[in-house]
Amino acid sequence: MKKTLILLIATLLCISVFAQRRESPDSKFIYMTSFGYATGLGEIHLMNNTGEELKTVQNRSFDIFVDQQLGYQFNPYFQMSLGAGFDFWKQTAFIPIYLNITVNFTDTKFEPIFYLNGGYAFKWYVSSVPDKMDRVVHGTSTGPMGETGIGLRINLNDRVSLVLAACYKNQYTDIRYTIPTPDEQDFSAYSTNAVQKALYHFAGVRLGVQY
């Protein structure tokens, strides 16, 4: 985790140094504050001690997120940023730190964009109480994260822009659950005794202000 954080900080420093050497009339430092909502997609297959499927859990998680980015626009079509934020799930929360690459397809007031985020999500908190419906605890460990999206940037003036995008997110983390033990009381509503890795998928929208 420390190596990931150091790598991302070093990347931002490299962006700053490179930007100072390659300035153009349209180059500038940029900041963006954004927030959004995404809903869970797909299924998670849980295994028992013998490697057989125990049950399938629907990804009913949701993700409410807020981010801040600091970066550099090299020209009207390309920018790179370092981002950090908070991701709030139903029973847990993450602090993602990531590198952002954004491509603008035009240099007009209304610009179609494509962006890609990649980094690592640290834990903020997690509840140990299983979900009442599925009797699992989602998102219990740190892990790599990614996001991609397409949208529209609306340039209000030379400094301020609105960004609206449809996004797809994923988070690699642990899911905790209970493997039934014969002749023992079922405590799956209160605790867990098994854990496995899972890749969570989300789709949603992001709204931001760049300045």
Question: Residue locations for each model-derived region?
Answer:
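Extracellular loop and loop/strand-boundary signature of outer-membrane beta-barrel proteins
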Residues: G51-T56, G85-D87, T102, D131-H138, ...
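Glycine- and aromatic-enriched membrane insertion/assembly motifs of diderm outer-membrane
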Residues: T50-T106
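Transmembrane beta-strands of outer-membrane beta-barrel pores
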Residues: Y37-L41, F86-K90, V103-F105, G118-W124, ...
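Repeated loop/turn-to-beta-strand initiation elements of outer-membrane beta-barrel proteins
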Residues: Y77-M80, K109-P112, I154, D158-L162
